[in-house]
Structure formats: C-alpha cells, structure tokens
C-alpha cells in the first residue's frame, strides 16, 4: 500500500492439516470417535465448509457424507478431520501509517479473537516494523511470536506491536507462509486470516508469488477487507509533501493493468490530482480482485468492513467459520507430473441441493 496510509491488522491464521503417519502396506485404520483417517505425503488437503439453506454452519458430518472429485474423477478420501479438531492461527498485524491512533483498537480486536478460540487452538503473529538501512528507514516484516497456545505470551506480543512507515503486504503474506504455515510435522488444520485493505506499498515480491506459495499449502484464506480509500483520497490531494504515495512498483502495476504504452512518471509527486485519484481507485480494485480470487480458490471468504470498529464482528464470524471447517485429504489418481491445474469439486452424498459446500477449488500438479 502507500506510505502513511491507514493500515490495519492483517491476521494470518494457520490450519495444520498434513498427515504424519507412514503409509505401510496395510490401510490406515479409521478412528470411530472423531472419524479420523490418517495417511502420508503428497496428500491434497481440501478445507470444506458446509452451510444449510439459511447459511447456518453444519456440524456433525462424517467422512462417509462427502465425495471429492478431481477434474471430474472421483477420488478416495484418505484423510478426514472433523470440525472439532484444533487448528493453528497466525496473526499478521499491519499497523503502518496513520493507524498509530488505532493501535489500541487493533490490539483489543486481536485479543478478543484470540480469546474466542478453543482450547488446543494455537496462534502465531507477524507484524510490520521500521528498520534503518544505510541511513534510510524501511518497512520490514517482524515475527512477533511463533505458533503457541500460551495466551499470556500472545497478549504480551500484542502489547509490543508498533507502527511502520510502509506496507510490505505481499512480503508479509510470504513470511507467514514460510515462517508460520509450513512444517510443524503435526496433524493440525490450518487457516490464514488477513485484516487490511490489501494494497501493498513496499514489497519486493508480487501477488503471483503469494499465490504460488500459498495455494499448494491447502489452507483456507480469509480476508477482513477494511475500506481505507476515503482516508487515502483525502490525503492524496494538495501539497505532495503531505500526500500519500505509492511505490514505483505499484505505479508500474497500475499502468500495466490499463495497458498503457506511453511513458509515465514513476514519481507519485509529479502526478496531478486527478491521476493520483485514478491510481488510487485502480489499485484498490486490483487489491479487491486479489483478495476475492485467493479466498475463492482456497475455500475461504472475504468479510467487508467499513472501518476497524467492524473488525470485531468479522473476527467472530471467522472464528465460527473455521471452527466448523472439515478437512478432507486425498492422493490424486492422476500420477502425471505435468504442472497443470487440476480442479477440485466436493459434494455431499444424498444431500444434493439441501446444503451448500465451500471448498478449495483446485491445485497445480508438480512438474518434472
């Protein structure tokens, strides 16, 4: 996003769904109490949320209630985790720019979200900070705490959150994947929750890299999209010394999205008021498109919020949603390593039209 823009908390939250049991010659046994089936590597993880006709979340389903298809071919469900099993959450706090006045609100909202999680659920947190490199300040990604179930340690980490002078949004998402979502070696579900407007200002990475990193992990991605555009546009007009600026990378991205061929100024201060507003409008549209795309592809959701005061309700909805998410896993019957995208479809047996199913849409197969 832009330097000094009202930024928000980005919560990344993690679902651990990888199986650890070695696959021997005998098939893994099913545990009747929690309908758990556990197997091994190269498992395709599929988070699934089921709702009834009025949108209420449905609990109590079993592995035998589901069917999963890959490119139209039914697959054998090798792993099933119920909605009662714990999950891991990573919170990414975006407190760049003018959110200085909102830090207490951000901390309270995050603290309530943590308190609403169940025993056994764990949390990790990432935030932004300002580093000084070669005499110049630069926004950076900061790991506040690794995944932990210690609520006291988490609240202490929240107290240490400060502000930054930029928004390395994409870098932070990649950092969450690398430092909090990967590995662990435990049979836990994972989910990523992001609170913010989704507009990057200082990252070295791009959205495509975020997609490439997150989609293979098989986690559901949720966004609380906070509308910061009115604040930004109010500050875009007038003296450039006080106006919010986009990075050179974002300006190039803006012109590229329009297919513009003419050489344009990469200095935001040299743009006129109307072009600054056009840049703002288009970059927010791109951010909205990216959030919707990633959430839909992974089986997550986007929760709109006009400001931070609505974040608490959105957090509560997400906590309920991920607390009733099932996790299916299968080994693809297509053994080709062709690097092609494979579409996933999940259905409920004998309940067609009665319940709605939201699930991961697909994945890209490995290539030789």
Q: What do these predicted ranges mean?
A:
Residues 9-19:
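Bacterial N-terminal signal peptides
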Residues 1-6:
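N-terminal secretory signal peptides that target proteins for export/translocation
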Residues 22-368:
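Scaffold/interface architecture of coatomer-like assemblies
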């Amino acid at each position: 996003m832009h330097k000094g823009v009202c930024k928000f908390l980005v919560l990344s939250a993690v679902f651990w769904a990888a199986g650890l049991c070695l696959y021997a010659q005998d098939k893994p046994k099913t545990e009747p109490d929690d309908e758990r089936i556990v197997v091994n590597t190269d498992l395709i993880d599929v988070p699934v949320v089921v709702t009834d006709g009025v949108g209420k979340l449905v609990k109590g389903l079993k592995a035998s209630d589901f069917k999963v298809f890959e490119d139209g071919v039914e697959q054998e469900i090798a792993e099933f985790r119920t909605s009662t099993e714990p999950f891991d959450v990573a919170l990414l706090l975006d407190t760049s720019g003018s959110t200085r006045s909102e830090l207490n609100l951000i901390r309270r909202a995050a603290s309530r979200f943590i308190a609403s999680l169940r025993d056994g659920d764990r949390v990790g947190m990432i935030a932004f900070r300002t580093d000084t490199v070669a005499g110049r300040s630069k926004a950076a990604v900061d790991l506040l705490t690794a995944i932990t179930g210690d609520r006291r340690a988490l609240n202490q980490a929240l107290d240490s959150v400060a502000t930054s002078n930029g928004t390395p949004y994409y870098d932070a998402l990649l950092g969450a994947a690398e430092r909090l979502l990967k590995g662990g070696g435990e049979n836990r579900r994972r989910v990523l929750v992001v609170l913010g407007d989704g507009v990057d200002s200082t990252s070295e990475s791009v959205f495509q890299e975020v997609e490439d990193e997150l989609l293979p992990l098989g986690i559901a991605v949720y966004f609380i999209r906070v509308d910061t555009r009115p604040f930004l546009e109010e500050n875009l007009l007038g003296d450039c010394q006080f106006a919010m600026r986009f990075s050179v990378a974002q300006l190039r991205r803006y012109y590229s999205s329009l297919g513009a061929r003419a050489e344009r100024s990469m200095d935001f201060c040299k743009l006129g008021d109307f072009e600054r507003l056009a840049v703002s409008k288009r970059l927010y549209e791109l951010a909205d498109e990216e959030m919707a795309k990633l959430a839909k592809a992974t089986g997550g959701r986007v929760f709109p919020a006009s400001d931070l005061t609505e974040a608490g309700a959105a957090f509560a909805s997400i906590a309920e949603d991920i607390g009733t998410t099932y996790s299916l896993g299968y080994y693809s019957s297509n053994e080709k390593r062709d690097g092609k995208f494979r579409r996933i479809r999940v259905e409920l047996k004998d309940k067609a039209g009665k319940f709605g199913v939201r699930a991961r849409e697909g994945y890209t197969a490995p290539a030789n």
